[in-house]
Amino acid sequence: MSALFGMGLGELTELMAGLGQKPYRARQVWEGLYKQRVGSLEEVTTLPVLLRAELAATGWVVGLPVMAQTAVSVDGTERYLMRMADGETVETVWMPDGDGGERGDGSEAAVEEAGEVETAEEAVAGVEADSSAALRNDSQKGKSNGNGEGKSNGGGEAVGDGGYWSRRGAGRDIRNFGTLAEKGFRRATICISSQVGCAVNCQFCLTAKLGIRRNLTAGEIAGQVAAVLNRHGIQIGKDRINLVFMGMGEPFLNYDEFMKSVRLLVEGMGIPESRMTVSTSGILPGIEAFAKETVRPKLALSLNASNDGVREEIMPITRKWNIAALLEAVQKIPLRNREWVTFEYVLLGGVNDQPVHAREVLALLAGMRAKVNLIVWNPGPGIAYHQPTPEDVAVFQGMLIEGGIATYIRRPRGRDIYAACGQLKRTVAEESGVQGLVAIGV
């Protein structure tokens, strides 16, 4: 079987020409794959029945990943086990965000930072605090939060006086703003995998324990997005969807397929690259190539240490490309208006979370258009690190802010179902003990 999903318009045009078809047939297939997000050839009803039959007879299928299982977190996060055609599996995460009623003021800054937390205690405290923070910051699907902020009155009309949707949609049918708005959400983020496993071997990450099995194709990368959007009935153009290439794998070690998937998502599915962020552990040739791209997501560099000595211990890739080389390459990326480079920093108790480290980070990032996302380490079996104290997290953040760096503490999402940062590892055989697991396919 050969997958159509993942082919560009030029490739589809060549395929149709080989079957004696005119170029407009390729456009019809393209529209079916990426705009309509069909699951089978039978759904591409703009194609003649005989042509659909010929494609099927010659081994062509749509080829979306199969959503084999899902686990649902208490905070609304969903983690999916995606099975590829050869049986390999990766994980993809869906994270819906609330209407901004508590912290959002309607500004772009509030929108961009809606996924972050305000306090160190919430980030460190574990699943219980994770749940309560999520319930406080996120609207529940299809339910009122007690104030009616941004919700529907049953007939679709926006009601309430505090939330984003009640401000934007007052007196109007909230369904006009998309599926997410109808469910009381402001936006959603999909976390995508780029490889089966990972070769980088970050010592604090569960995915590293898998090793690397293979790269994903562009169709398998973009196909994760299509499968998740279909599950939730998302309407591109109405619903606000953000994509983060932060799942299993190192995107810049699968650079060509990663960038092809970006083009498919932008040109085919209509998701702007400004709504995408790619995270890299620091693959220097990839960063250099990325700087030359005309269509590219935002960049997030996993810094995670303030000096090469500590970074080599927790991220052995540093022995190949040190911090200075990475920062030099990052500074050559032409930034758009209101764009910055994000530096991710996983806080490990007693390893990289002390004031001396914060001072070193400030020195590294001095003069850069930078934002720092602090990520409290998410525990995993067999990994001998521990979380920092809330006091150390708060001091670290405060020092960076005082030094002029916009610094946020990421709100952990899906920690209870191993869906949080650094926890994507589990397989079908390991899932029996995870609460909330639902089998949705074979």
Language-model segments: which ranges?
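Conserved Radical SAM active-site core
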Residues: 99-122, 145, 153, 157-298, ...
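Short beta-strand motif preference
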Residues: 80, 92, 188-192, 301
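Auxiliary Fe-S-binding modules of radical SAM enzymes
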Residues: 1-127, 151, 155-167, 331-339, ...
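Conserved AdoMet/S-adenosylmethionine-binding subsite of the radical SAM
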Residues: 227-408
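Hydrophobic alpha-helical membrane-insertion segments
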Residues: 120, 136-141, 149
